[in-house]
UniProtKB/Swiss-Prot annotation:
General function of this protein: Catalyzes the reversible adenylation of nicotinate mononucleotide (NaMN) to nicotinic acid adenine dinucleotide (NaAD).
Gene designation per UniProt: nadD
rRNA-binding as UniProt keyword: no
One GO biological process term: NAD biosynthetic process
The protein's name: Probable nicotinate-nucleotide adenylyltransferase
EC number: 2.7.7.18
Keywords: ATP-binding, NAD, Nucleotide-binding, Nucleotidyltransferase, Pyridine nucleotide biosynthesis, Transferase
Length: 210
């Protein structure tokens, strides 16, 4: 069965709501993860802690509708880098349903599947503040907001407004991107401290992004 729409609670109201419920609270951070980097991990961990979620799932996309497929490496590498990145990390796991389904990854289709598979879970879909502005353009957005509670990661000095229910989480600015890391590697520069060392070692070993 589908989840009921959650209103845009404050964090305190959210905690009170969870105390009265036996349902699991699971966050989802989707992305191309090409490659995963430290900012991804900080977002996932801080949202989990600040909202008191049971777990956050990192969900690699198969064919995101907004990403150039030519820039995306094979999914086996992206998945392996995710596995390496969260080894021994509490509260983070991987959801592979979009990779298994193949095709274009629309959030509505994914969340409809997940809510049907896990009717005892409330899902929190994590997006950046810049993506909040684009919610009206998301595929089947009016139906999607009935399946998930959106969580917006607020950037310093960035003011996003939306009529859709969003819980806001404040995080320090981390100006790290996957494209930056790929560019470093292409130019022969080591992106030290921008991503987990195990992930960087894997990239070097496999000769990725050369």
């Amino acid at each position: 069965m589908a989840l009921e729409l959650l209103t845009p609670f404050t964090k305190v109201e959210l905690e009170e709501e969870k105390k009265e419920s036996n349902r699991k609270q699971i966050g989802i951070l989707g992305g191309n993860f090409n490659p995963i980097h430290n900012a991804h991990l900080v977002v996932a961990d801080q949202v989990r802690q600040q909202l008191g979620l049971d777990q956050v799932l990192l969900m690699p996309e198969c064919k995101p509708p907004h990403v150039d497929a030519k820039e995306t490496i094979d999914e086996k590498h992206r998945l392996r880098m995710l596995e390496l990145a969260i080894e021994d990390v509490e509260g983070l796991a991987i959801e592979t349903c979009e990779l298994e389904r193949q095709g274009i990854s629309y959030t509505y289709d994914t969340m409809l599947y997940l809510t049907e598979q896990h009717p005892d879970v409330d899902f929190y879909f994590i997006i950046g503040a810049d993506m909040v502005d684009y919610l009206p353009k998301w595929h089947r957005i009016d139906e999607l907001v009935k399946l998930v509670q959106f969580v917006g990661v607020q950037r310093p000095k960035y003011k996003a407004g939306t009529s859709y229910p969003v819980i806001w989480v404040d995080l320090p600015l981390m100006d790290i991107s996957s494209s930056m890391i790929r560019d470093f590697i292409k130019k022969g520069r080591q992106p030290n401290y921008l991503l987990p060392k195990r992930v960087l070692d894997y990239i070097t070993q496999e000769g990725l992004y050369q």
